[in-house]
Amino acid sequence: MKHLSVKGYTLIEIMIVVAIMSVVTALVSPLLTNMTSFWRLTQARTLIQRDARVSMDLMNRAIRQAQSSTIVLSNYPNQPPYSEISFTDVKGNFVSFYQEGNYLYEKFNTTVSMMTKNLEFVSFTFPDSSDPGILSVAMTTQKSTYLGRSKALELSIEEVRVMN
């Protein structure tokens, strides 16, 4: 009688493979979740830092060129107090920075451009009401990350000296 060669896996071998794969999956899943969370957090931090620095730099440069007698602090409709500044610069251009929702806009004469879409709060104030040549600018940016969390970066208040 011929002996038949049966090829295949036994039930025990399959159960061992399933058990090993289950253990590996259980160990790798949290690692992948943590890696994704870290990557998105780092990406959000980099984005909001860049947005905040660029926006603050552009606002500071423009405010330095303002005619101090033309500076008006107000708020855009339905926005936080003192979230808008408008003035005329030394060349006679009308300049305005304002918050609308989570966006920061710059208006230069009639041209409006978005500076950042990650704005949480911006405020323009005179720290010393007797000196209209010094203005404080405070700004908070925020970006959503992984699993509904958010990362916020608050820049400290920067004082800007109006040169004109």
PLM regions with names:
Residues 2, 9-57:
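Aliphatic-rich helix starts adjacent to a transmembrane/signal segment
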Residues 5, 89, 145:
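Acidic surface patches and DE-rich sequence motifs
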Residues 24, 71-72:
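Short, hydrophobic secondary-structure boundary micro-motifs
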Residues 46-47, 53, 70, 114, ...:
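Residue-level preference for alpha-helix termini and adjacent loops
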Residues 72-131:
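Type IV pilin-like appendage domain
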Residues 112-164:
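Short linear sequence signals and composition-biased patches located at protein termini or domain-edge surfaces
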